[in-house]
Amino acid sequence: MMKAKRKVIGDQASWVIANEQVRLAVTRRGGHMAPVTFCRDTDNPVRPYYVSPWQGEGLKIDEPVLVPLRGDFFCMPFGAPSTHRGESHVCHGEPATAKWKCRGVKADGEVTRLTMTMKTKVRPGKVTKRLQLVAGHNVVYVQHVLEGYSGGVSLGHHATLAVGDREGSIRVATSPFRLGMTNPGVVGDPAERQYQSLAIGEEFTSLAEVPLLWKDPATADCTRFPARTGFTDLLGVFAKPEECPAWTTATVEDEGFLWFALKDPAV
């Protein structure tokens, strides 16, 4: 194991690994992965991930996950802050908000791997994060190993993409899903100076026709983004259990690239 390169990026202490195709940074606080540069050996490198604009402004931020907010990060439990069976969890859990320890970088032939660990306290256990780059691949291979836990928990990878201003400039698609549903509760609360447009707790079978709160139009095309500027919306799709990976894509037409994520639908 080699010592990982450490650098302050966007106000956050981060570890950095790279090969000819990809360079990535991951924050010590929360393990948020960004910036990530793909295709760095070409004339048109791609940086698909968002980095929150308040970094370096010295703001007091009460929600821990918003302090380093950027890129992609692991959530356990995924969701709003809540108390469950005596466990009081912050939004998206300790892995997305607490400090990780770097265990080093290993370069083995064409593979470069960064390993990080965290011992959680609210629900005691250990999480091992591995971020891996392979020569010739414009991909980040991500693995999280959970040890010592018992009981159910919602897991999630929170990919946060940088989005331009032009409405509908990103095309969103997914693998086949068995259930689509809008959030069962209020997401955009006017009392918090937010508004939502999607209906509450409604099922759907196509991203192109997702129920809205109003009747005209009654549905929204969620295969295009940005859309309905000014509204805060949330929906979920649940993959069909198949042997093939579940996937999500975002085609960024103005910049000429496609971002994708693959995962095991059984997890």
Question: Where are the regions that the model predicts?
Answer:
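Surface-exposed acidic/polar loop and edge beta-strand patches at domain peripheries
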Residues: 1-141, 149-154, 158-267
